[in-house]
Amino acid sequence: MTFQDSSHDKPPKDDMPPSPDRPIDSSGPYCISAIYREDVATFDFPIGANLTIMQITHDGDDRDRTVSVRTAGEIRLRRIPKDSSRGTKAFLTVDVHVSDPSLHVAKTWDHERKVLQVSTPQYARLASSGPHCVSLEVTAWFPEDAEFSNLLIESFDLTLRVIEDIKINVSGESKFATVLGRVAFPSASLLGSSTELPTTTSSTALDGSGSSSAGKASSGVPFSSRRILVETVSGSISGCYPLMDYLGMTAQSGSIKVDAFPQPVLPDAPKPAELEVQTASGSIEVNLPVRDALSSKYIPPPRNYITSIHSSAGSIKGSYYLGSTSNFRSMSGSIHIVTMPVLQAGSSDQSGLPQNTFATHTVSGSIKAEVLDPVFITMVPYVEERPERPPHPTPYLPIGDDDPYIIIPPSTNKALFKVDDPESFKSKTLRNLKSSHGSQSASISISYPAVWEGSFHAKSMSGSIKWAGDGLQIIRDKNGFASHEVLLRKGVDSEKEGCFVEMSDIAGSLRFAVGTTI
């Protein structure tokens, strides 16, 4: 092992974690004290299988006689340069700078399992004074349109970064997990025109047989994976992510601020598009593209969307889709969101349609939710292909028209959808959404589009209840001892028809609007 003095490489000014503004091709270390550079280690790997990259730590020598050592840096996913001497063969590079030549960084490459493990010391017996640091940059270089089965990137100290020039597809699961570092995907501004929103349904619509011409991501997000898991303890999560079958994000004290671009369903194995985001104390902001004044013709891929957003103490903001299940919960943080229903038209009491649910709940944080005009879709039942079986005699009589039996409606978990004609949206009403909005001490303000039809029930112990909207009929407006109860209807004769909105509070005010603001 040889070392070079890299103090002339213009390292950062201090030993802070790497800045988001750090040049992508900077050759300097991530900490100023790491002035000795090891020879760059290189490992070739084949595409098409699994790939695992891990950064772990080891204790080093006896802690009683050693000094602590910090690790800083990144694990990066990048596209191979066009002028690369390796052509289009994928490879890994490990670039190490250390503050003392005695520091040992272990690198292990298991070619059979496709696993790279890099271990950095937490402590070391060193003669020189500190602070001591290991600067580590691991880069996975991929050819364009590389494909993998599964991808696992894990680290204790490092930031995990996907560079905007990458273009790979993972058919299975991709997991990015770090304890102290951030997780950063490219931002929508860096991706540029590749994330322009579609304004027609041609790329996502299904014909009567349930086939689809959308084999790839319609929005051109460069990193594609059916399932993506992103986890960090103290770092933040940022960037632009595809929403295919599952997008899960978890942070303890770090914040989450991302854009999510929905992608078409996989016709051969249709699943819901599930978005799950959780934090303990960090804030959450996820933005999915919705139909608004700037993109009034946008049509998302017709799918069943499932959303679960939860924070113990952080606020929740952003724009989301309302599908079969949508839950937003925070203990002490506020919930301020814009939502767009992507649902089947009609009521749950008609044609056996399942009831869709939308819930927002806090303990002390305020709630403000706006429901936009819906995008209506129609289910195309998915028929799983099974090998034909030869007919065989049966001692049982076939079921006749007069025999009792149950018709089970198709499940949205295994179904294809097509977008209804956008011109027909104006003649349809939103009648298939059951909502609940509750808080203990904070105010709640909910607005629904003019096409909403159903019942509204609200109850508050000491707070006021106000409403606005054409066509709302007062069924009950009752003021009792330490309580106020209201029941309204629009376009229905009973609570069993159309949508149903339940609002409850102990001390906060309640505001409900249909087709207007209040």
Label each region the model flagged:
Residues M1-I518:
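Intrinsically disordered, low-complexity terminal regions
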